[in-house]
Amino acid sequence: MMTVCAEQHVNFIHSDAASLLNDIEQRLDQLLPVESERDLVGAAMRDGALAPGKRIRPLLLLLAARDLGCNATPAGLLDLACAVEMVHAASLILDDMPCMDDAQLRRGRPTIHCQYGEHVAILAAVALLSKAFGVVAAAEGLTATARADAVAELSHAVGMQGLVQGQFKDLSEGDKPRSADAILMTNHYKTSTLFCASMQMASIVAEASGEAREQLHRFSLNLGQAFQLLDDLTDGMADTGKDAHQDEGKSTLVNLLGPQAVETRLRDHLRCASEHLLSACQDGYATHHFVQAWFEKKLAAVS
């Protein structure tokens, strides 16, 4: 049973995260203006990035940076977080396209290509990626070296060692029989790499030690796997904001091993993630408490 002190601490973390979430959404609103009523690409960019979402990656970037003792100006750090969310939004727009996952619903709304057409959706995704890198390159309060390193981390997460590779593997192998290891590798590219970039960007700005950066890398790898396993477990549930049963006929760990075994694996990944996170952030625990509370709430809904 949670003590009064612990409950108050968790409530504070939730309140803090809500405040950061508001900051992220306000800044995204500023960074993604629509020039005119005819600016369909701009409107699609805004809808893709500002549709109601979890904002887990930018929240973790901000929380981890603070736990690491980051002294960068709030504006510069916030811009890095928003850039991560733009990359994530761009990847979702592309994932949902008819030639890929052919999804009709995302974040409780019609997908971008359903609203604006495929041509606008593709252009909006490319423009979001371009905007994200520009925002990082111009982030206030960071040294030129820090900005360049942050751009490199984000670039790595997008390309053939990240989101692009993950989506290609999912499209080319997802409907074929696969081993658990092959599925985990796809999950790594699809999900873990952007978490890794988020944590490494926080580390860069906070000037964290090499050991802390390595621990955060390991945290991100495990967190990404846990996140993807949770996504697989909730496929078919009505309140995810996405098309139900998207994984039918796909070789996921849930289909291979069953929900109970996957939940056990998920909790193992969370435990490992927690150990690495606490090793990296020894003077701040906001990130740890946020991750634990978020997953426990989600797991309670599927148990």
Model segments located where?
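N-terminal amphipathic/basic leader segments beginning at the initiator methionine
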Residues: M1-L32
